[in-house]
């Protein structure tokens, strides 16, 4: 199972270059059931605000698509994950949002995190997959 960082959805929605195409291809594979995926409920916030800053007309549509995406579990952020994220912050000095994504991916037993963010490379317990 793949854990999707917010940047996968952002690139898919607004990037017209190769990385945007790769993100759209990955999401299509998930949609068709070729891959299973998960992401945090917090991804909604990141995706909405990032897209709203660049292409406000796409923010709501993209957010609805994310929240209703087939073959993808949306994992709630809770106290247990927040405590786990604090442990990750302490050990790897990640930003809180990145640590929450890492904690969520690890708790969900994801095979890897799909992200363009190199901060995730610090974690020995979680492999990062590029788009």
State where each predicted segment sits.
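Acidic, PIN/NYN-like endoribonuclease modules and their adjacent C-terminal/linker elements
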Residues: 1, 73, 102-131
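Short, well-structured N-terminal submotif of metal-dependent ribonuclease cores
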Residues: 1-39, 52-61
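Histidine- and aromatic-rich ligand-binding microenvironments
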Residues: 4-5, 39-41, 94-95, 117, ...
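Conserved glycosyltransferase catalytic-site signature
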Residues: 6, 41, 79, 98-102
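Acidic catalytic patch
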Residues: 15, 70-91
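Structured helix-beta-strand junction loops
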Residues: 32-34, 69-70, 91, 123
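Amphipathic alpha-helical segments within well-ordered protein domains
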Residues: 45-48, 86
């Amino acid at each position: 199972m793949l854990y999707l960082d917010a940047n996968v959805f952002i690139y898919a929605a607004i990037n017209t270059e190769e990385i945007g195409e790769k993100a759209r291809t990955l999401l299509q594979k998930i949609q068709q059931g070729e891959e299973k995926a998960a992401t945090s409920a917090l991804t909604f916030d990141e995706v909405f605000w990032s897209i709203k800053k660049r292409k406000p007309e796409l923010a709501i549509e993209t957010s609805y698509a994310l929240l209703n995406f087939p073959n993808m579990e949306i994992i709630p952020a809770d106290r247990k994950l927040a405590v786990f994220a604090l442990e990750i912050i302490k050990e790897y000095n990640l930003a809180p949002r990145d640590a929450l994504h890492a904690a969520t991916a690890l708790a969900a037993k994801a095979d890897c995190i799909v992200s363009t963010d190199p901060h995730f490379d610090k974690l020995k317990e979680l492999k990062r997959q590029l788009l």
